[in-house]
Amino acid sequence: MASLCLSSSRIVSLHHQKPFLSLKLRSRPSDLSGLGRHTSPVCFNPLRLSGDRQRTATVSTRVEKRRKRGSSVVCYAAPISANSLQWISTISCLALMLARGTGIHKSVVVPLFALHAPSSIVAWIKGEYGVWAAFLALIARLFFTFPGELELPFIALLLVIVAPYQVMNIRGKQEGAIIAIAISGFLAFQHFSRAGSLEKAYEKGSVLATVAIIGVTVVSLLLLL
């Protein structure tokens, strides 16, 4: 009977151990199956890696080009407008009227001023303020003596006021540009011929008149083109 008890106890122990072993063996595949569900296989593709590198290099090249374009200095020379040229000629004419180191006939500068004066100045002279300025200057001229340099601006003021429409209409046209070139060429010939030489024309007393005559001549040529 003892042997039977021993054998039965062994059988019972073996019976109790089998489920424990079977549970351990079954738990491992379940863990592996869980890992298979939550993880994905990692594959190395060299072609995909090279394509990503090429895209990165292309993007960096574009960014560098944009930076270079943004930081580069762009030089652009805008053409001078006709209004700016008229202002240059007007200032040059006034400088010739007031300059002393020249032997030109300054009265010839007055029609050149009327031809090249900007439209804003002509409108101001022909307006109420210009008429009052001419009236007061004329009253002062009756009682006082003006120097020769100050008489020429006053004469130019009166010339613009009393000039008829047909004469002022040639301003800005080819006819007016041809007349202006003829006047400026005559003034340049007088100035440089009476100065004696180019060195004397650029001396301290004549440099202002020389620069003004060059400016008037160049502006007249540019307005004709």
Curated annotation (Swiss-Prot):
Source organism per UniProt: Arabidopsis thaliana
Family: Belongs to the Cold-regulated 413 protein family.
Chloroplast intermembrane-side segments: 99-102, 150-151, 197-204
Stromal compartment residues: 77, 124-128, 173-175
Record keywords: Chloroplast, Membrane, Plastid, Plastid inner membrane, Transit peptide, Transmembrane, Transmembrane helix
Domain of life assignment: Eukaryota
Database matches in InterPro entries: COR413 (IPR008892)
GO cellular component: chloroplast; chloroplast envelope; chloroplast inner membrane; chloroplast thylakoid membrane
Range annotated as the organelle transit peptide: 1-76
Inducers of expression: Accumulates in response to abscisic acid (ABA), cold, freezing and drought treatments.
Name of this protein: Cold-regulated 413 inner membrane protein 1, chloroplastic
One GO BP annotation of this record: response to abscisic acid
Compartments where located: Plastid, Chloroplast inner membrane
Membrane topology: Multi-pass membrane protein
Paired cysteines (S-S): none
Keyword Plastid set for record: yes
Annotated transmembrane regions: 78-98, 103-123, 129-149, 152-172, 176-196, 205-225
Keyword Transit peptide recorded: yes
